[in-house]
Amino acid sequence: MSSTFSFDVVSKLDMQEFDNALNQAKKELQQRYDLKNTNSSIEFNQKDMQLTLESADEFSLKSVVDIIESKMIKRGISIKSLDFGKVEPASQKSVRQKISLKEGIDKENAKKITNAVKDMKLKVQASVQGEEVRISGKSKDELQTVMSALKEMDLPVPLQFTNYR
């Protein structure tokens, strides 16, 4: 019986954990003494998957970004899923920064993953399926080797492995 095994390489954001991290960041923002009179705020547009940060100056905006990053790391969310926009001036001498959330593996990174799998010279196949990459092969050991190699790759998107069969 020659059965094949496979797994999917995906880049998904756990929205529940992200929401928890965001709520913790908002709570800390209200309690921090150094950010008291800076009118700093964090707003999340769920439809556009975009964070909007506002603060009195760039220094306090950097502190808000640090708060968000630390809360995300504590909740186990990779900060690679954040795409930082430029810091732009807003009303009344304040500054604003938009941060987009990235989900899914784009074609360029999917191609890098498939090429890396082919360069390993293992008996596995990689195929791009929309925003995920399916790796299949006859040996579970080879699939685990591919998994560990992909974890060590430095890609601009966080990777998760699902549908291991």
Curated annotation (Swiss-Prot):
The keyword Membrane does not apply. The keyword Plastid does not apply. CDD domains: YajQ_like (cd11740). GO terms for molecular function: nucleotide binding. Keywords: Nucleotide-binding. GO terms for cellular component: cytosol. Coiled coil: none annotated. Nucleotide-binding protein. Belongs to the YajQ family. This is Nucleotide-binding protein Ctha_0558.
